[in-house]
């Protein structure tokens, strides 16, 4: 369907309406339907989702209107719906009826237990999310200027980062790992030194997972789709470079909120990211593209369709 741009991506965690409430779910498939291929009678972006903690028999296709981003605003909406549902339950007295023939009281009780359990799970999940430590990554002023130029080149000048980049994300992070191992800063703890390789691998994995969902401007999506088509087995960390890695660091705080990581490891991770950015400043002329690639009129029209 022309002009339809999916707001959610495969493997993204979301909040999904099921009945009157919102539940955590994961996007398994994403498709844009039109009148010729719709399965539900609706057109536009649709998603096949799996509800967290539910059996696969509940997996289903839903339109985009059934989904919300998994963030504080989404949790606020879910909390409001839970409160409204609780008030509604109190107002009806909870005595219920005799149920449908053959259902029996046991069936009704089981249904109520199931609903209550899902409600508790939702509240516990939200509570856990709100308790997770926040990671604040401070971007150095020098790199903020790089980000501004990057944004203007892509969104204002209709230019692109030429791909594949050299060095790519995987290569430059390996360069940093070797640099950090050789420097062995005295203030770095033994645990921090031991975690270096694991953290580099983790950042690379985050990049591969986040790029398509969170790190691209709309104008870059057609280029991304083409790269995926040409390199179906190649991770994006072997195609994209410093420009997009820097965008990851800008968004790293919210990403970490969705992981189970202890405070000490969190601080070590933050310190390494800060150190990586300082190293990137030293290597700025080599790592960042000086001139972006001009695009054709055809590409510009394609990216806006």
Curated annotation (Swiss-Prot):
<dbReference type="Pfam" id="PF05712">
    <property type="entry name" value="MRG"/>
</dbReference>
<dbReference type="InterPro" id="IPR053820">
    <property type="entry name" value="MSL3_chromo-like"/>
</dbReference>
<comment type="similarity">
    <text>Belongs to the MRG family.</text>
</comment>
<dbReference type="Pfam" id="PF22732">
    <property type="entry name" value="MSL3_chromo-like"/>
</dbReference>
<dbReference type="GO" id="GO:0032221">
    <property type="term" value="C:Rpd3S complex"/>
</dbReference>
<keyword id="KW-0156">Chromatin regulator</keyword>
<dbReference type="GO" id="GO:0035267">
    <property type="term" value="C:NuA4 histone acetyltransferase complex"/>
</dbReference>
<feature type="region of interest" description="Disordered">
    <location>
        <begin position="86"/>
        <end position="127"/>
    </location>
</feature>
<keyword id="KW-0539">Nucleus</keyword>
<keyword id="KW-0227">DNA damage</keyword>
<dbReference type="GO" id="GO:0006355">
    <property type="term" value="P:regulation of DNA-templated transcription"/>
</dbReference>
<protein>
    <recommendedName>
        <fullName>Chromatin modification-related protein EAF3</fullName>
    </recommendedName>
</protein>
<feature type="compositionally biased region" description="Gly residues">
    <location>
        <begin position="91"/>
        <end position="106"/>
    </location>
</feature>
<comment type="subunit">
    <text>Component of the NuA4 histone acetyltransferase complex.</text>
</comment>
<dbReference type="GO" id="GO:0006338">
    <property type="term" value="P:chromatin remodeling"/>
</dbReference>
<keyword id="KW-0805">Transcription regulation</keyword>
<dbReference type="InterPro" id="IPR038217">
    <property type="entry name" value="MRG_C_sf"/>
</dbReference>
<keyword id="KW-0234">DNA repair</keyword>
<dbReference type="InterPro" id="IPR000953">
    <property type="entry name" value="Chromo/chromo_shadow_dom"/>
</dbReference>
<feature type="domain" description="Tudor-knot">
    <location>
        <begin position="14"/>
        <end position="67"/>
    </location>
</feature>
<keyword id="KW-0804">Transcription</keyword>
<dbReference type="InterPro" id="IPR016197">
    <property type="entry name" value="Chromo-like_dom_sf"/>
</dbReference>
<dbReference type="GO" id="GO:0006281">
    <property type="term" value="P:DNA repair"/>
</dbReference>
<dbReference type="InterPro" id="IPR008676">
    <property type="entry name" value="MRG"/>
</dbReference>
<dbReference type="InterPro" id="IPR026541">
    <property type="entry name" value="MRG_dom"/>
</dbReference>
<comment type="function">
    <text>Involved in deacetylation of histones, chromatin assembly and chromosome segregation. May act as a transcriptional oscillator, directing histone deacetylases to specific chromosomal domains. Component of the NuA4 histone acetyltransferase complex which is involved in transcriptional activation of selected genes principally by acetylation of nucleosomal histone H4 and H2A. The NuA4 complex is also involved in DNA repair.</text>
</comment>
<feature type="domain" description="MRG">
    <location>
        <begin position="131"/>
        <end position="304"/>
    </location>
</feature>
């Amino acid at each position: 369907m022309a002009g339809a741009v999916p707001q959610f991506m495969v493997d993204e965690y979301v909040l999904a309406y099921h009945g009157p409430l919102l539940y955590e779910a994961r996007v398994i498939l994403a498709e844009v339907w039109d009148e010729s291929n719709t399965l539900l009678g609706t057109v536009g972006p649709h998603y096949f989702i799996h509800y967290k903690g539910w059996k696969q028999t509940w997996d289903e296709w839903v339109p985009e209107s059934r989904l919300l981003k998994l963030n504080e605003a989404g949790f606020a909406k879910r909390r409001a719906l839970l409160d409204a549902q609780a008030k509604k339950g109190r107002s009806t007295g909870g005595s219920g009826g005799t149920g449908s023939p053959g259902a029996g009281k046991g069936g009704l009780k089981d249904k109520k237990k199931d609903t209550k359990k899902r409600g508790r799970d939702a509240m516990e999940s939200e509570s856990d999310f709100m308790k997770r430590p926040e990671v604040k990554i401070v971007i150095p002023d020098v790199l903020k200027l790089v980000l501004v130029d990057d944004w203007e080149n892509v969104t204002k000048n209709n230019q692109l980062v030429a791909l594949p980049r050299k060095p790519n994300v995987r290569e430059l992070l390996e360069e940093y790992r070797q640099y950090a191992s050789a420097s062995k800063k005295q203030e770095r703890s033994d645990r921090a030194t031991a975690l270096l390789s694991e953290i580099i691998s983790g950042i690379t994995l985050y990049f591969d997972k986040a790029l398509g969902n969170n790190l691209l401007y709309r104008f870059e999506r057609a280029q991304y789709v083409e790269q995926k088509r040409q390199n179906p087995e190649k991770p994006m960390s072997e195609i994209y470079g410093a420009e997009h890695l820097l965008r990851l660091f800008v968004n790293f705080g919210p990403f970490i909120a969705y992981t189970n990581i202890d405070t000490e490891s969190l601080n070590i991770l933050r310190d390494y990211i800060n150190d990586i950015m300082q190293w990137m400043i030293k290597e700025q002329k080599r790592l960042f593209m000086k001139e972006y690639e001009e695009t054709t009129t055809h590409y510009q029209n394609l990216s806006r369709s």
